[in-house]
């Protein structure tokens, strides 16, 4: 009986040993693959974090460069503006711009005609309202009438306008030639008046002393 059970037991032992060795080989074959898979995932994460860090660094450098460029441009603009304000002679300007910004002189402004408004006034360029302040004319108000175009405006409105402009606010007629003519006529009139004053020669004869007059009367 012992001899009959021996082959079966040895075969079982052989089978178990074969199965164990097969399983162990399978496990040994699978473990390196798992280890390699874990090692393969680690470089991917490292590469991702490196790319994100590089992108953030590039973005930060771009922001710093843009801020620096903006600061430089602003400093240059402020410096050029301060230079223009401190040295207005160096600013190129045309005669037309200078005349527009300067306005007319007060002496020529006072020579422009002034009328008292009334509803019955018969002037073609005078309407019913002032185009500067957009208020209606009231009877008795003083209006200044511009030459050539004959447009009328409130005295205070047009005087303030003409201190900064050389044109009519309604038709944009230029008043440069007119004002120059007014000033030249005014200067000529002043010169004539001064010449007439200088040419007047007043001679007053001296009076005789009272004592001589009394003596002459007594003797006569």
UniProtKB/Swiss-Prot annotation:
Pfam families: zf-RING_2
Single Gene Ontology MF annotation: zinc ion binding
Gene3D superfamilies: Zinc/RING finger domain, C3HC4 (zinc finger) (3.30.40.10)
Zinc finger (RING-type): 130-172
Name of the top EC class for this enzyme: transferase
Record-level GO BP terms: protein ubiquitination
Enzyme nomenclature, EC number: 2.3.2.27
CDD domains according to UniProt: RING-H2_EL5-like
Catalytic activity entry: S-ubiquitinyl-[E2 ubiquitin-conjugating enzyme]-L-cysteine + [acceptor protein]-L-lysine = [E2 ubiquitin-conjugating enzyme]-L-cysteine + N(6)-ubiquitinyl-[acceptor protein]-L-lysine
Keyword Zinc assigned: yes
One GO cellular component term noted in the UniProt record for this chain: membrane
Coiled coil ranges: none
Keywords of this entry: Membrane, Metal-binding, Transferase, Transmembrane, Transmembrane helix, Ubl conjugation pathway, Zinc, Zinc-finger
PANTHER family: RING-H2 FINGER PROTEIN ATL77, RING-H2 FINGER PROTEIN ATL78
Assigned protein family: Belongs to the RING-type zinc finger family. ATL subfamily.
Protein name: RING-H2 finger protein ATL77
UniProt gene name: ATL77
